Amino acid sequence: MQNLKNTTKEQKEILSNAESILYTCKNDLGNFIESEVIKSNGKYYRLQATNKHITEFTEV
């Protein structure tokens, strides 16, 4: 995912070093819901964003 809004400094650092493992995107009545699993510094993270606004950012 690129150009995400409302990211923290820590999230930006994780995203800058991340490798995408799985990415999906769906259009739900005009809302673009993106989901992605990334790997950064040996840790895995699950992200979800709606219209480029992060709704979930968790380590798995």
Question: Would you name each region that the model predicts?
Answer:
Residues 2-12:
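Mixed-charge, Lys/Arg-rich low-complexity intrinsically disordered regions
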Residues 17-60:
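Acidic, low-complexity, intrinsically disordered interaction modules
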